[in-house]
Regions:
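Short, well-ordered coil/turn segments that N-cap beta-strands
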Residues: 13-17, 52-55, 84-86, 115, ...
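Active-site beta-loop-alpha junctions enriched in small/polar residues
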Residues: 20-26, 62-64, 93-97, 122, ...
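Active-site-adjacent beta->alpha loops and helix N-cap segments on the catalytic face
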Residues: 66-81, 97-101, 122-136, 188-198, ...
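Conserved, mostly hydrophobic/aromatic
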Residues: 19, 57, 91, 117, ...
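A C-terminal functional module that forms or caps the active site or interfaces directly
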Residues: 187-234, 238-239
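Conserved anion-binding
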Residues: 25, 96-184, 202
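Short amphipathic alpha-helices and their capping/turn segments at secondary-structure boundaries
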Residues: 1-13, 46-48, 125-134, 218-225
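Conserved N-terminal beta1-alpha1 strand-loop-helix module at the mouth
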Residues: 1-87, 247-248, 253-264, 268-271
Length: 272
């Protein structure tokens, strides 16, 4: 998917919502456990009910990989369910180099046809560029994440006072472009989102941490939006686990619509 196609979806739906698919078997509604593939049934109903409001879906591959070969089959089936005009993200956080990275890219881009994959850039250029060699595909680099442990490394400063995440942003812009490179920027870092935007004015951000983790959607839009929106704000638990009853998918739809309505207002206010 191209940047222009992604922005067209945002404009059409007045939304920059990414629905995270984290199907924890222990948290699924009880009635689904009698299904041949409970995880697939869960994701299928979530996608069907939220597709009107979502511009992206982000399956967390760990929740599929944990079930071995069957889990991989389920992941492939879920990816195939995502409408082709909606951006798909393999949240796999791969981070190896060379031929290994190329094989990861083939797995997610060629065999499962995801539009993008999350990548850990700790090993440097060698761990990122293999993903950028696939036309129409994206690498989404972990830059400034929302978890408490991000303080261990990402905000460490060098002798000049530059934080490690800033070095990641600076160097990685040499490897890709706003057409194939995004960054993970956590919503709980609201005070720093504006600084990240100044450093990478054109790139899209994938923003976790809104809702259950305490991040502010309004702050994300205020400090992070650019002329192409430039934001994919992820919500997982707040949507997919809003109900554990048989109405879970309908409740998920309502929660997705609530976020979309907030996003419509923010797009009207800040898109320029």
């Amino acid at each position: 998917m191209t940047r222009a196609e992604l922005f067209a979806q945002i404009q059409q739906k007045s939304s920059f919502l990414c629905v995270g698919l984290d199907p924890d078997l222990d948290k699924l509604p009880a009635h689904l456990h009698s299904e041949p593939d409970p995880i697939f049934s869960f994701c299928q109903q979530i996608i069907e009910e939220t597709a009107d409001f979502a511009v992206a879906y982000k399956p967390n591959t760990a929740f599929f990989e944990a079930h071995g070969a069957k889990g991989w089959e389920t992941l492939a089936k879920v990816e195939a369910l995502i409408p082709k005009h909606i951006f798909s993200i393999a949240d796999a956080k791969r981070g190896d180099i060379g031929n290994t990275a190329t094989r990861y890219a083939e797995a997610f881009f060629t065999h499962m046809n995801f539009d993008s994959i999350t990548v850990a850039p700790y090993m440097g250029k060698d761990s990122v560029t293999p993903f950028l060699e696939f036309e129409g595909k994206w690498a989404i680099l972990l830059a400034l994440t929302s978890n408490p442990g991000s303080l261990d490394f990402q905000l460490l400063q060098d002798a000049s006072g530059k934080a490690l995440y800033q070095t990641v942003l600076e160097k990685s812009q040499e490897w890709g472009s706003p057409e194939n490179l995004m960054y993970v920027v956590g919503a709980t870092r609201g005070e720093l989102i504006g600084e990240v935007r100044k450093q990478v004015p054109e790139h899209f951000f994938l923003v976790p941490g809104v809702g259950a983790q305490g991040g502010s959607l309004a702050d994300v839009a205020r400090f992070g939006m650019n002329s192409s929106c430039g934001l994919l704000v992820n919500s997982s638990r707040g949507i997919i686990y809003a109900s554990k009853e048989k109405d879970f998918a309908k409740v998920a739809r309502r929660e997705a619509q609530k976020l979309q309505e907030e996003m419509r207002e923010l797009l009207d206010r800040y898109l320029h």
